[in-house]
Design a protein with these regions (language model features):
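Short, conserved beta-strand element in jelly-roll/cupin
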Residues: 48-52, 62-79, 117-119
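Hydrophobic small-molecule pocket/channel-lining residues, especially in calycin-type beta-barrels
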Residues: 55-56, 63, 77, 126, ...
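Short acidic-glycine-tyrosine-enriched beta hairpin
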Residues: 83-101
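A generic "binding-loop/recognition-motif" signal
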Residues: 65, 84, 100-101, 110, ...
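Basic/polar N-terminal segments that are highly enriched at the extreme N-terminus
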Residues: 1-21, 158-160
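A short glycine-rich, His/Asp/Glu-containing loop-to-beta-strand
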Residues: 20-60, 66-67
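Double-stranded beta-helix
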Residues: 107-160
Length: 160
């Protein structure tokens, strides 16, 4: 989408880390919502993912309506590219186009931090909020419940 104006506009926004909404998962992983789709005019979403050592994450899955990218800041998390798991190091970047099978976890003995960028900027945080609520309350989820949650947030699970 292009900007059609002639003079530009005052529209830049900034947020401090203290102002960012955070979510702590049952595993201890902290999701920091740096930029949500609602704050970027749905251009993209950017999250900072902070995982404790030896923490599971997302098994193989794909998305039909958005791409996802990962950039490792610290630690050695592992990423699944649809065929193999690779232990990454700081500076590693993974781009996953729509339909690309992927997953992530931190099976290393040290904490790991990475950025997750997705485009367009859908309300992806709702998926992680739901997972955190399920973990915090211990709510039982039937196969049908999981299927509904995955469908609502474009999370198509596969083996891997």
């Amino acid at each position: 989408m292009s900007y059609e104006g002639e003079l530009g506009e005052v529209s830049a926004t900034g947020v401090s880390q203290a102002e960012m909404r955070t979510l702590t998962m049952k595993s201890g992983t902290v999701a920091r919502f740096v930029a949500t789709g609602s704050s970027t005019r749905a251009d993209f979403g950017l999250y900072r993912w902070e995982m404790p050592a030896n923490t599971g994450g997302a098994t193989g899955h794909f998305h039909r309506t958005f791409s996802e990218s990962f950039y490792v800041l610290d630690g050695k998390p592992s990423f699944f590219d649809g065929e193999t798991w690779t232990q990454a190091e700081p500076g590693f970047f993974l781009y996953v186009p729509r339909g690309g099978i992927h997953g992530f976890r931190n099976d290393s003995p040290m904490p790991a931090t990475f950025l997750i960028l997705f485009s367009p900027g859908i309300a992806r945080e709702g998926y992680f909020e739901a997972l955190a609520e399920i973990g915090a309350t211990g709510r039982h989820m039937s196969k049908a419940d999981w299927a509904e949650l995955y469908a609502r947030f474009d999370q198509v699970m596969v083996e891997g």
